[in-house]
Amino acid sequence: MSNLSVNAIRFLGVDAINQSNSGHPGVVMGAAPMGYTLFTRQMHVNPEVPNWINRDRFVLSAGHGSMLLYALLHLSGFKDLSIEELKQFRQWGSKTPGHPEFGHTVGVDATSGPLGQGIAMAVGMAQAERFLASRYNKEGFPIFDHYTYVIAGDGCFMEGVSAEASSYAGLQKLDKLIVLYDSNDINLDGETKDSFTEDVRARYEAYGWNTEFVQDGTDIEAINAAIESAKASGKPSLIEVKTIIGHGAPNKQGTNGVHGAPLGPDETAAARENLGWNHAPFEIPKEVYADFKENTVDRGRQAYDTWVALVDEYKQSYPELGSELARILEGKDAVEFQSSDFPAVENGYSQATRNSSQDALNVIADKVPTFLGGSADLAHSNMTYIKSEGLQDDEHRLNRNIQFGVREFAMGAILNGMSLHGGLRVYGGTFFVFSDYVKAAVRLSALQGLPVTYVFTHDSIAVGEDGPTHEPIEHLAGLRAIPNLNVYRPADARETQAAWYQAVTSKSTPTALVLTCLLYTSDAADE
């Protein structure tokens, strides 16, 4: 049965890519057994309640393989992904764009495509789960108890952002993060031996990860056993799965020719014969749907129903936390923040806006227990520290100060993952000139409609003693050019409060706060 279902995934991908005359069939054909194992053996999802906050998360970091995800969602009963939608793959207005888009297609947990960011966002999801579990879980009430899974390819591990984020995840011991490495030795330009020869598992062991190895990427039982071993490790896990790109396409498998182009009619016919798939394009045997109904849909629905009953009992046993949880489940902040919560700013009050920002964010932190964030090793310069808290780590999971280290890009992507998870308000800080390092993540914040707040300080030539490398010049224009990003450059303490209020009440727009170290005075004209 499993072989039939895996081939169904493969040929949904092949046929949709052929029809659109565009796409990446190789990863779909090679990674289909991994996707099948995750959805039918491991993950708890409910297509009837796709935004269930305690669902297992799945991030296809190798977003060019989007038809793998769309095929899995279709077979798992997600209504957005009908056969007709699969036939519209990569077409204008469809639910099946070339790369997965969060908020556009139900069942997609993250917008991916820029390689490596999917891994980093998954790190954020795992950290969000850990924080929320630490705050809300009680004995007998595992309200937040799920895993975050990733399928990533060689290209993802070449990108620096995955290295930054993975180093951080190992430090944090995020043991509910499991990354499956689609290790096929091929990239778009040829073989990875020409550009990428390091021992990835050894690198991840140095990060503090558990690693597993599956020699045969078609062996579902071995893949499943590796996942079970990963779950017992107490660490984030990397599972290297050796696959053949384009598995089953006899003349193209194992080559870069199957990476980024349709198989075409002749090779598709040969693959059908080679894999014993005797079905017309987009024709799926009823046994495949039955397999997914029993092992994905019904299993997920049962898990969801059990969880709903648990939440109802929890609200009775812990009414105060239950009230916060109820708001989170409605898509709201645990506690509502109002502009009147800020203290009044007196006329004539002089303060640098970075200091005004610290005052404001501490007022917010005192009111909203699910507001947290940090800085890329500049907390005391960016003034991003929550004064009532210590640093968050594996032994202090409830603390709300996050020390991201000098990892600006990963910080932004991790914040995106935390926001994608739901239930949290998050922020991160660095020098304004280093917004260049984080801008790719800021762009994904905007594309995904995530209300992440970026605190950029030292916006002034007054940092001139550091030299031109640290003087932001073109950066404001660059941020303002990003659609769906609110950029605030407040002039004094009052405007800084107003900017923070807009940031923490935003529903679907990220915010960039551009702040200085110079004194600014509030006067009556500001009122």
What does each of the following model-derived ranges do?
Residues D312-D436, V442-L450:
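Non-catalytic terminal/interface segments that mediate subunit docking, oligomerization
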